[in-house]
Amino acid sequence: MRELLISVKAQGHINDLLLSEPKLVKKIFSLIADIQKHPFGGIGKPEALKHDFAGSWSRRITDEHRLVYDVTDEKIMIIRCKDHYDDK
C-alpha cells in the first residue's frame, strides 16, 4: 500500500471545512480511502489534470470543491481539498 501524505495546505482546508461544512470532511475522508484502493478510478469522477496541474489527479467533492492529489509508486500526496483547481 502506498504511503498517504497530506500537504499543509490540504490540512488547512480540512480544518476550515470542519468549521464551515463538517459533512464535507466525511466525504473527503471517504474519497481518500477510495484513492488508496483505486488511485485512478473509483468514486468522485477521477480526472487526470492538464496544463499547470499535469501529473495530478482530481476528484469531485461537490460542484464547488475538488480534492487534488498526486500518485507515485510509493506514495499518495493530497495537495488540496477546497475550492476548484482552476481557482488560483
Feature locations, PLM:
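Enriched for short, Lys/Arg-rich terminal
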Residues: E3, Q11-S30, I43, K50, ...
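Residue-level signal for threonine
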Residues: S7
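Generic detector of intrinsically disordered, low-complexity, polar/charged segments
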Residues: H38-G41, D52
